[in-house]
Every structure is written in C-alpha cells, then in structure tokens.
Design a protein with these regions (language model features):
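The beta1-alpha1 cofactor-binding region of Rossmann-like NAD(H)/NADP(H)-dependent oxidoreductases
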Residues: 5, 23-34, 67
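Conserved NAD(P)H cofactor-binding loop of Rossmann-fold oxidoreductase domains
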Residues: 53-58
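Substrate-binding pocket helix/loop in short-chain dehydrogenase/reductase
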Residues: 60-62, 66-71
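Active-site loop immediately N-terminal to the catalytic Tyr-X3-Lys motif
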Residues: 111-115
C-alpha cells in the first residue's frame, strides 16, 4: 500500500507480530522487490496474494482523454499485478496458497469515460481465469472479485479530487 499512516495504525491495532506494512508504489518493481526480499523472517512466507492496487483516472470520452492517465492505469492495473503475481507464484504454488484479484463490473459493463479502466479490469478478469486454468491441480486457489459502485476514496481520485463529482 501507499498509505503509510493507515498501515501503521493497522499494525498498532493488530500487533507487529501479526502485521508488517510495506509501503511502496506497485509500479516500481525495484522498490517492490526490495520490500519483498527484505521482509522479516516471520513474514517471509506468503500464503495469500491480494492484488488490490488499482486506479481509474479521468472521466472523459476516449478522444478527449489524457494518454498519460491511460499509461498509469495500464501500469498499475495490469503490469504491476502481473509482475507481482509472477514473482510470488513459485512460493504460492509451494505453499498451496491463494490469489485474489480485484477486478470490477467495469470489466463487462462499459460506461462513458471508462474505456481504459474497463479494459484493464477485463484483463484482470481474463488473467484470473487463465491463472486458475494454469494452476489447476497445484492446490492454489485463484479468484476475482468484481464489485460495482462502492463509496470509497477511489471515485474521488477518479474525479480529480472532487468529492461532489464522485
């Protein structure tokens, strides 16, 4: 995650022996790998990967959208998810773990301005199905959660910080 103060509060609540926060941008593979490789021994064996990092930027029609926003969504919602999953797959197979990918109903229900975001979530859905097929028989469980509209900070980010628009 990237919300250090919230993660620290959760660690305080759960205890440092039960929760070790890692704060980094999932798009930065070097920083991510250092964080994972530097985990304390008690947290070095991962049983469950929850790919929850994701974002949607902008609400404009495709022809008016900012290409840089599209690239950030693809890098976060697809590239980082695939890269992190691949890095942890050997350990998850060894431990018969679980992978939970956060997709969205936007994967199958298009809406104006949701072009690239919906495309990234369609990828997550299909990637989950492919992983489940590849990992069949290994004991690794793979699932995708595809929520609809949920009142979170996510929509505030999408609308550029406008609580009212979200």
């Amino acid at each position: 995650g990237r919300r250090a103060e919230r993660l620290k509060a959760l660690q305080d609540e759960l205890g440092a022996d039960r929760f070790h926060p890692c704060v980094f941008d999932v798009r930065d593979e070097d920083v991510r790998d250092k964080a994972l490789d530097g985990l304390p021994e008690a947290f070095g064996q991962i049983d469950c990967l929850v790919n929850n990092a994701g974002l949607a930027l902008g609400t404009e029609a495709a022809q008016e959208s900012d290409l840089d926003n599209w690239k950030v969504m693809i890098d976060t919602n697809i590239t980082a998810l695939v890269s992190l999953t691949r890095k942890l797959l050997p350990m998850l197979v060894e431990r018969k773990g679980a992978i939970v990918n956060l997709s969205s109903v936007a994967a199958t229900y298009p809406y104006p301005g949701g072009n690239v975001y919906g495309g990234t979530k369609a990828f997550v859905h299909q990637f989950t199905l492919g992983l489940r097929s590849d990992l069949h028989g290994t004991g690794v469980r793979v699932t995708s959660i595809e929520p609809g509209m949920v009142e979170t900070e996510f929509t505030v980010v999408r609308t550029g910080g406008s609580q009212q628009a979200s």
